[in-house]
């Protein structure tokens, strides 16, 4: 006879964790609303929060036993929100929420990885300009990227811990068949809208935790919806952007299509070469060159 999973009680640690995750989803929807976000996204996160709060089995148990598919199978939980829940369960943080709250510093996130203390986390952000666990993994896999206090054995141990942590999240974030990146035209147009409105003082602002000793609300935030794409744009507040004086130039674009997981792009002013002075999407320079030349780009 098949047995059913045990049902938790109100005060069980698993259901308490469910409540905390539901509260985070609700907080995110409230921040979206206060910052002028799209109504569809606001409702999606609120509906997900309600379903999580009603759930009688711990999300952690579901995730451990069934992976991302178990989360996606829940009512009102699409792939994007499933990836967010997996991130919270795996790292204890949710970068999307941290971002809208102005808590964009990656050092605390990096310290959740075994082998990384406060000093090493700070060096990673300063020398690698790493902002996410994915950034950190990419930098550590590059043998040319050196940082003091990080020998080969420690580097390998951190990489192993990172890979194990990110593997399950990647499976959820992997694009569906037919999935695609946003067109560079969309990213460049959103970038232009953001910088124009920011310069005119027409955007809501948040107070970033990093490089803001006075706690001022200075970082403009823009939420846009275009053709099924949901975008959030902010100026970069990274250590490298501050060091190079690019905080009013580098624009971070976080976007997802419908209920898909989030992607991140950076738009900057090209400083040399044939596109000098033009805005380009890092990593997609060839597409930007075709766009600025008036040629078909695709997507």
Say what each PLM segment does.
Residues 126-130, 137:
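Short, positively charged, Gly/Tyr-enriched micro-motifs
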Residues 1-99, 164-299:
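Structure-specific DNA junction-binding interface
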Residues 80-87, 118-126, 154-159:
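Catalytic DNA-binding helix-loop module of base-excision-repair DNA glycosylases/AP lyases
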Residues 111-119:
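Short, solvent-exposed interaction modules
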Residues 152, 156-168:
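Long, contiguous binding/interaction regions
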Residues 139-157:
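Conserved glycine-bearing catalytic or ligand-binding loops at nucleotide- and phosphate-handling centers
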Residues 130-132, 144:
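Hydrophobic or amphipathic alpha-helical targeting/insertion segments
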């Amino acid at each position: 006879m098949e047995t059913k999973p045990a049902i938790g009680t109100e005060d069980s640690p698993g259901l308490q964790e469910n409540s905390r995750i539901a509260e985070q989803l609700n907080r995110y929807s409230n921040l979206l609303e206060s910052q002028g976000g799209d109504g569809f996204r606001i409702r999606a996160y609120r509906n997900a929060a309600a379903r999580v709060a009603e759930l009688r089995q711990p999300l952690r148990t579901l995730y451990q036993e069934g992976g991302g598919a178990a989360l996606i199978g829940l009512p009102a939980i699409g792939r994007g929100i499933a990836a967010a829940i997996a991130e919270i369960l795996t790292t204890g943080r949710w970068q999307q929420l941290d971002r809208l709250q102005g808590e964009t510093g990656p050092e605390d996130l990096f310290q959740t990885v075994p082998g990384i203390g406060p000093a090493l986390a700070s060096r990673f952000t300063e020398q690698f300009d790493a902002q996410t666990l994915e950034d950190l993994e990419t930098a550590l896999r590059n043998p040319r990227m050196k940082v003091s206090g990080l020998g080969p054995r420690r580097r390998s141990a951190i990489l192993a811990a990172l890979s194990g942590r990110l593997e399950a999240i990647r499976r959820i974030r992997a694009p569906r068949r037919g999935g695609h990146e946003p067109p560079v035209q969309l990213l460049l147009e959103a970038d232009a809208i953001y910088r124009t409105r920011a310069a005119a003082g027409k955007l809501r602002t948040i107070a970033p935790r990093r490089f803001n000793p006075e706690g001022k609300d200075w970082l403009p935030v823009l939420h846009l919806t275009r053709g099924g794409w949901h975008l959030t744009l902010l100026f970069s507040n990274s250590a490298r952007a501050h060091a190079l004086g690019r905080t009013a130039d580098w624009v971070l674009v976080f976007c997802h299509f419908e209920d898909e997981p989030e992607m991140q792009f950076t738009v900057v002013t090209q400083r040399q070469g044939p596109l000098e002075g033009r805005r380009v999407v890092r990593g997609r320079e060839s597409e930007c060159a075709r766009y600025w030349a008036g040629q078909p780009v695709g997507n």
